[in-house]
């Protein structure tokens, strides 16, 4: 072995041995807990929040120098924002020789994060004095989270969710020094996230997973996978913060989800059964949810075959209409709004009214619900379904910006596509009106006798074709 190489190896070995000796001495003689108040004060000043360590502090040197803290709490404006059973900071050893602390890794075990938005639109992690301030540069090799819980509550809208059993692995997390409004433009990272279950007041998502990659203000989340309504959904999201206004692109599909699982979120009774396919492609922009909704453009699709509608024999009800004239097409048309997008439209609907018909079942051979989305409003392109003997179609639009029905008409159509019976819906999603507002106050009211016979509208046998889409008439 060359002499120079021997010298290098001996020097390296000696240096490593010296580090081991120093580490052992520190472990024996340094009480890390004596420095806890200083650490809490420094962290509080850096974050602009109250940081407290309720448990012990420990120092480790293998596989690298680290500080372990137990029972960590971060509070802002008097309320807990983040808590963790254990937090470990991996610190680069060499900068310490120059009295510099450089954190390379952060690992959190059993953390809980509570984010809240008050009625004024302010988040609990925001500080008025820090608004518009400069954020320090950040460079972390790795951030990991295990068995975490995230809770979000929006007191302004009443929405919220809880995500449990979450793990997060972030690599190469870098933030250039910048003003706080430019945070996303100067942030870069790669990450993988998984959550066992996410619960909202309307539905539950399980086995959520996605990979994320962000650089120069552009963030790609793909693939985003989850289980919802008994189906396996997948898609991707791109968020671009490089411009003056953030832009978003969302592509999502949920094949073969169970319609009975969807209706479980609204009724304890089994409204319908069968598998359906849902997909959506949307683009939007804005800094708030309202702005994003107002600029939403794209398309949404819902399709299904061989479905069963419980509690009502539609063909029998339609055949009895001549004598009874006491059937509500709106009840039947509600099935066109099944799936993720329909949650906003149907949350105020009492689906038990569908079950008050002839106490039979209906076979739906085919259902198609195709929508075009422009500026936050969905317009029906091809919306219809066929039973064994009849077809029902829908015209009109859904205004998600204002939460209203735009001249929606549900019609019973003949083999030529002409309307035999029609019923109009207007008003808000929560308080829609059918034909005459003074008769129907909400969709949850009693069935209406508001159906108009096609022959009364179009005398002489000729009519304007109401439906010419892809759902063929029964044979």
Set out the residue ranges of the language-model regions.
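Extended hydrophobic secondary-structure segments that form protein cores and membrane-embedded regions
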Residues: 105-108, 143, 190-193, 252, ...
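Secondary-structure transition motifs
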Residues: 49, 66, 71-186, 304-359, ...
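Extended lipid/amphipathic-ligand handling interfaces
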Residues: 43, 54-60, 74, 84-101, ...
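Extended terminal
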Residues: 2-16, 283, 287-297, 301, ...
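N-terminal amphipathic/hydrophobic interface segments
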Residues: 6-9, 19-74, 175, 205-206
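Outer-membrane beta-barrel proteins
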Residues: 115-118, 202, 259-263, 309-313, ...
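Right-handed parallel beta-helix
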Residues: 190, 195-211, 364, 368
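Transmembrane beta-strands of outer-membrane beta-barrel pores
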Residues: 110, 197-199, 241, 256, ...
């Amino acid at each position: 072995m060359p002499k120079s190489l021997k010298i290098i190896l001996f020097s390296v070995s000696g240096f490593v041995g010296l580090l081991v000796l120093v580490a052992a001495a520190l472990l024996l003689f340094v009480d890390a807990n004596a420095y806890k108040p200083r650490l809490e004060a420094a962290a509080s000043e850096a974050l602009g929040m109250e940081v407290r360590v309720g448990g012990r502090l420990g120092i480790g040197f293998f596989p690298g120098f680290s500080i372990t803290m137990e029972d960590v709490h971060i509070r802002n404006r008097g309320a807990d924002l983040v808590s963790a059973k254990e937090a470990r900071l991996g610190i680069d050893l060499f900068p310490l020789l120059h009295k510099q602390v450089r954190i390379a890794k952060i690992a959190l075990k059993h953390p809980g994060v509570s984010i809240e938005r008050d009625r004024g639109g302010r988040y609990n992690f925001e500080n008025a004095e820090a608004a518009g301030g400069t954020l320090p540069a950040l460079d972390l090799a790795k951030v990991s989270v295990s068995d975490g819980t995230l809770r979000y509550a929006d007191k302004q809208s009443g929405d919220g969710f809880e995500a449990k059993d979450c793990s997060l692995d972030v690599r190469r997390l870098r933030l250039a020094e910048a003003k706080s409004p430019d945070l996303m433009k100067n942030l870069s990272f790669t990450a993988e996230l998984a959550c066992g279950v996410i619960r909202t007041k309307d539905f539950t998502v399980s086995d959520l997973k996605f990979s994320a990659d962000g650089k120069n203000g552009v963030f790609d989340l793909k693939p985003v996978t989850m289980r919802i309504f008994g189906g396996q959904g997948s898609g991707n999201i791109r968020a671009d913060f490089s411009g003056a206004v953030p832009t978003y692109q969302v592509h999502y599909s949920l094949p073969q989800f169970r319609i009975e699982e969807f209706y479980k979120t609204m009724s304890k009774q089994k409204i319908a059964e069968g598998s359906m396919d849902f997909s959506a492609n949307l683009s939007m922009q804005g800094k708030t949810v309202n702005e994003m909704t107002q600029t939403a453009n794209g398309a949404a699709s819902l399709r299904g075959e061989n479905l069963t509608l419980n509690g009502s024999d539609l063909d029998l009800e339609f055949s009895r209409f001549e004598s009874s004239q006491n059937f509500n097409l709106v009840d039947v048309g509600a099935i066109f709004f099944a799936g993720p997008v329909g949650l906003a439209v149907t949350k105020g609907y009492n689906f038990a009214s569908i079950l008050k018909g002839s106490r039979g079942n209906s076979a739906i051979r085919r259902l198609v619900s195709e929508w075009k989305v422009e500026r936050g409003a969905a317009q029906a392109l091809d919306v219809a379904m066929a039973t064994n003997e009849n077809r029902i179609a829908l015209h009109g639009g859904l205004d998600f910006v204002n939460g209203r029905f735009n001249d929606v008409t549900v019609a019973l159509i003949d083999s030529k596509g002409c309307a035999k019976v029609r019923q109009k819906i207007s008003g808000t999603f929560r308080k829609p009106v059918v034909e005459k507002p003074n008769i129907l106050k909400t969709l949850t009211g009693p069935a209406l006798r508001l159906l108009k016979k096609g022959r009364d509208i179009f005398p002489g046998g000729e009519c304007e074709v109401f439906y010419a889409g892809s759902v063929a008439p029964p044979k």
